[in-house]
């Protein structure tokens, strides 16, 4: 595996530079580089100078031109404003105007959105798409009531476990020192049900922790794992997909509402045109990242059918446990209803 470091770097450079979608599907445009009295300050964990940011900058230039620079964005990239919870806090205090988030960050504003990421609830990304489309309008209204504009949905990708020892059973997972993203209530509940003592920390701390051995296992999409260089410190990944990561960009409503009707129409049209392209790009890059890891020496361990079934039963128990804590019974019922609709097609 270590003989493939050159390949790792080459692959992680091209793929990692395009991982913006892991954080939010980021449908807002990046900074146009031109100052404006109404310039929006948007924070993201995505790296500056990446190929993905270059694409978004082209779009930002287009928006700036169409609005005569009345609408511009300034991105604070690479986590310089902190982890997602830090950005949320700064938004509430007026330090930031918006952020590009995974569902972990989004749930700091509206916890119920995590109902879309329940463990083992979807059998495919297409199934998730169908349910998400049916429910996204509800989440947009909930965010608006709390003073935020939730934009179009983005993808993080299929979530797998990555480790330095093969994980074929829940017992194997219990033996590992597994990362837990801060106090993520959903993953924490799943880990508790399995009997895993997660090691809580923010995303920027994961790679150093893998380096020192503080943790020896983590979870995420292939694209995130390559982009963040985690895969250079692990040897195995599970074939099982436990969930499909959801993301989006959020803007403070008071900032959004300052736009004129004309500019609002232009911005909405631009965001809409980029939404599908970004989701498509993230899905393609997740597949490329998966292949790149395998070429670099990471071994994919086929998850036994009995283990998948065990995780499914554990997941179903967690769905019920989190009712009233993250989302309502009605929210869960709607997810299951729309899932059944899709499966009946």
Model-inferred region functions:
Residues 20-31:
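Bacterial N-terminal signal peptides
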Residues 37-127, 135, 139, 143-345:
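N-terminal secretory/targeting leader peptides
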Residues 16-21, 35:
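Low-complexity, intrinsically disordered segments with a bias for serine/threonine
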Residues 31-32, 67:
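Short linear Ser/Thr-Pro motifs
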């Amino acid at each position: 595996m270590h003989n493939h470091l050159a390949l790792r770097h080459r692959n992680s450079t091209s793929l990692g530079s395009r991982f913006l979608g892991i954080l939010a599907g980021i449908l807002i445009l990046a900074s146009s580089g031109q100052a404006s009295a109404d310039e929006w300050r948007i924070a993201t964990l995505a790296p500056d100078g990446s190929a993905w940011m270059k694409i978004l900058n082209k779009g930002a230039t287009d928006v700036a031109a169409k609005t005569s620079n009345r609408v511009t964005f300034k991105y604070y990239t690479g986590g310089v404003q902190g982890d997602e919870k830090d950005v949320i806090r700064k938004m509430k205090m007026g330090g930031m105007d918006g952020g590009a988030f995974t569902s972990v960050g989004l749930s700091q504003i509206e916890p119920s959105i995590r109902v879309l990421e329940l463990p083992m609830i979807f059998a495919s990304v297409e199934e998730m798409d169908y349910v998400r489309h049916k429910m996204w309008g509800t989440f947009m209204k909930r965010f608006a009531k709390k003073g935020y504009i939730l934009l179009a949905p983005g993808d993080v990708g299929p979530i797998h476990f990555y480790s330095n020892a093969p994980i074929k059973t829940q017992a194997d997972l219990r033996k590992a020192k597994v990362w837990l993203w801060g106090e993520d209530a959903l993953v924490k509940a799943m880990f508790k049900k399995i009997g895993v003592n997660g090691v809580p920390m923010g995303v920027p701390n994961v790679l150093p922790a893998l380096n020192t051995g503080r943790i020896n296992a983590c979870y995420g999409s292939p694209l995130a794992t390559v982009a963040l260089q985690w895969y250079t410190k692990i040897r195995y990944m599970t074939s099982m997909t436990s969930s499909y990561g959801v993301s989006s960009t959020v803007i403070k409503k008071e900032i959004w509402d300052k736009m004129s009707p004309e500019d609002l129409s232009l911005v909405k049209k631009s965001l809409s045109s980029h939404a599908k392209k970004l989701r498509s790009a993230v899905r393609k890059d997740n597949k490329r990242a998966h292949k790149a890891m395998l070429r670099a020496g990471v071994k994919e361990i086929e998850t036994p059918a009995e283990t998948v079934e065990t995780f499914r039963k554990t997941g179903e128990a967690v769905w019920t446990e989190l009712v009233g804590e993250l989302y309502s019974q009605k929210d869960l019922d709607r997810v299951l209803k729309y899932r059944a609709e899709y499966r009946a097609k």
